Amino acid sequence: MAIARRCAYKIHPMDITKISTGDNPPEEINVIIEVPVGGEPVKYEFDKESGALFVDRILHTPMRYPTNYGFIPHTLSPDGDALDAMVVARSPFVPGCVVRARPIAVLMIEDEAGGDEKILAVPVDTTFPYYNRVGERSDLPHIVMEQIEHFFTHYKDLEKEKWVRIGKWGDKDEAFRIVRESIERAKQSK
């Protein structure tokens, strides 16, 4: 017979409003992780109202995320969501954690909902110095960009009425511009 145990701790939803965009945006940003690198094909999303992490959907195409994936708080993309961010790291980060990161590029994507830019970033040097010499996407192995493009090209393949078109990669300056614009857009929407 199984004995029920009381949980010794409570999980409290995160108050996203108390997490800043970063110490020095756009050069240093905070990314709230929703999906870890190599994670199961489950798309999680934070609910802005409750601060809880919800399962958005199980990806129909059995693929694993090539980076840690999340969003930059207090930003707003043209699609109405927070600005997406991919954090390259050798280790998976737990969904719900906040990672301080440096943008190095941006991938322009269009899907059935419209434009959907994704910032490519690496952890700040004090978090993980492995990437301290990475200043642009060209400093990463080329296969990293190929894996990211392949993932986003195909991860919706088996979902009806969904599609993705990969656009161009923008450099660090373009990523900074998009971060700044998304911060301004979020401020204006309040």
Residue ranges and their predicted role:
Residues 11-190:
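Hydrophobic N-terminal alpha-helices or hydrophobic patches in metabolic proteins across all domains
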